């Protein structure tokens, strides 16, 4: 969601008013230009904050809906790994506000659609960053929630409950449901047998930003877990937003 107008006081949006007050209470941002740049599938919203030639991102994460602390925690982990993730400039955990460094507005998906020939270089950079996360993440992964059997079952259930049942109206009969549950058991068993690493959990083209230095910038990492080593690389190469010929994936 892109907004062209600067954010001002809004009698219908208490969160915007609080964010405005918090940002403008800092001497460096009293007269900053603040514009909403996006929202995501959660309750979080993001705003670009410009002051002179500098640009930052403010994150609004309502504390009753989202865990701002998990973003802060994982961001610090990634910073220690020298991975290109947003740095925390200022934080107000109680209110659910963070001020972050700005990684720009070009995500991998947009670049790949416009310039498919850039795929090789972009994916090589992404895989190098993923290797850093898995290698240096050994120090931090046990501090993350486990991607255990319970969580795997919950996420697999989304396929049937939301896609099959609600979205396309497909109801499984007894035989189909039995086969589906057997498939889930096999997938869960396979995942639990794999070596455990630091898992981003949404490592795909919309969460990777093309940057001039230390490409890619990595965002939307707050749901990181300790889980199977193949999870993130499959998210990247079997991206739900863009598909590649099998020969290219291999």
Question: For each predicted feature, which ranges?
Answer:
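Glycan-recognition and catalytic cores of secretory/periplasmic carbohydrate-active enzymes
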Residues: 149, 153, 205, 225-227, ...
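Active-site activation/catalytic loop segments of kinase-like enzymes and analogous catalytic loops
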Residues: 158-167, 230-250
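ATP-binding pocket architecture of kinase catalytic cores
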Residues: 47-149, 153-154, 168, 192-193
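Juxta-kinase regulatory segment immediately upstream of eukaryotic protein kinase catalytic domains
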Residues: 2-30
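An alpha-helical support segment within catalytic cores of ATP-dependent transferases
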Residues: 19, 25, 138-145, 150-151, ...
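ATP-binding glycine-rich phosphate-binding loop
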Residues: 29-47
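Active-site acidic catalytic loop and adjacent metal/ATP-binding pocket
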Residues: 43-50, 58, 133, 184-231, ...
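Short glycine-enriched loops at secondary-structure junctions
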Residues: 39, 93-95, 224
């Amino acid at each position: 969601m892109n907004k062209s107008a600067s954010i001002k006081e809004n009698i219908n949006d208490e969160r915007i008013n609080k964010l405005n007050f918090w940002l403008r209470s800092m001497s460096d941002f009293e007269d900053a230009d603040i514009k909403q740049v996006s929202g995501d599938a959660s309750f979080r919203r993001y705003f670009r904050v410009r002051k002179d030639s500098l640009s930052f991102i403010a994150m609004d994460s309502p504390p009753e809906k989202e865990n701002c602390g998990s973003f802060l925690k994982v961001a610090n982990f990634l910073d220690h790994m020298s991975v290109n993730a947003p740095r925390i400039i200022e934080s107000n955990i109680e209110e659910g506000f963070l001020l972050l460094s700005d990684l720009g507005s070009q995500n991998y998906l947009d670049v790949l659609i416009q310039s498919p020939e850039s795929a090789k270089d972009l994916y090589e950079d992404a895989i190098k960053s993923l290797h850093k996360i898995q290698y240096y993440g050994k120090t931090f992964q046990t501090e993350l929630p486990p991607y255990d059997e319970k969580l795997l079952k919950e996420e697999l259930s989304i396929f049937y409950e939301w896609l099959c049942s609600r979205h396309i109206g497909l109801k499984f009969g007894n035989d189909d449901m039995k086969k589906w549950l057997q498939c889930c058991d096999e997938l869960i068993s396979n995942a639990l047998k794999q070596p455990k690493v630091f898992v981003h959990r949404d490592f795909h083209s919309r969460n990777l930003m093309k940057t001039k230095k230390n490409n890619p910038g990595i965002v939307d990492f707050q749901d990181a877990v300790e889980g199977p080593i193949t999870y993130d690389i499959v998210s990247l190469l079997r991206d739900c937003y863009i598909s590649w010929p099998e020969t290219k994936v291999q």
